[in-house]
């Protein structure tokens, strides 16, 4: 038994492509896409997410980790989890979709439990403190008194936990 993965994306093609990529690196892990709407448009579908979660839960599951692309996909995934008989078996990862999915799939392939799979996905986004000094600085930031590494260099974005304008756009 391994941890199962569910990919929730606004785009069916993105979900399918991300699953295809991760499956190349973790052939024994069940990875299910739940992308797009039922009528083929961009958006999320509560029914698609619930179906993927139910399918993943039906297959000797050691837990399910869900990865999402954008904010409303998170809300859809959270809503779907609330409808499950055992919502405690599902963890939502706060990670970039493609990179996080690949890391999660490899961790699941290696036998990690659901918390370890979630942690692997999230470590892609937030490197462990021990590795921060090895990350190339993104800018010189005198107001912080240090070089930003693996974080937004825009001061207003840093104050908002990474949400803010992107320089040069």
List PLM regions with ranges:
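N-terminal loops that bind phosphate or other acidic moieties
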Residues: 1-169
């Amino acid at each position: 038994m391994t941890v199962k993965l569910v990919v929730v994306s606004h785009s069916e093609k993105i979900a399918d492509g991300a699953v295809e990529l991760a499956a190349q690196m973790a052939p024994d892990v069940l990875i299910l896409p739940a992308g797009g709407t039922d009528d083929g448009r961009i958006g999320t579908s509560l029914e698609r997410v619930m179906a993927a979660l139910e399918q993943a839960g039906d297959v000797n599951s050691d837990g399910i980790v869900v990865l999402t692309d954008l904010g409303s996909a998170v809300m859809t995934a959270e809503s779907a989890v609330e409808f499950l008989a055992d919502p405690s078996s599902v963890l939502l990862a706060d990670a970039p979709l493609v990179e996080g999915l690949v890391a999660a799939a490899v961790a699941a392939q290696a036998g990690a439990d659901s918390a370890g799979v979630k942690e692997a996905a999230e470590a892609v986004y937030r490197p462990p403190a021990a590795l921060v000094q090895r990350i190339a600085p993104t800018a010189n930031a005198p107001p912080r008194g240090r070089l930003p590494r693996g974080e937004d260099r825009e001061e207003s974005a840093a104050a908002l936990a990474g949400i803010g304008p992107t320089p040069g756009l």
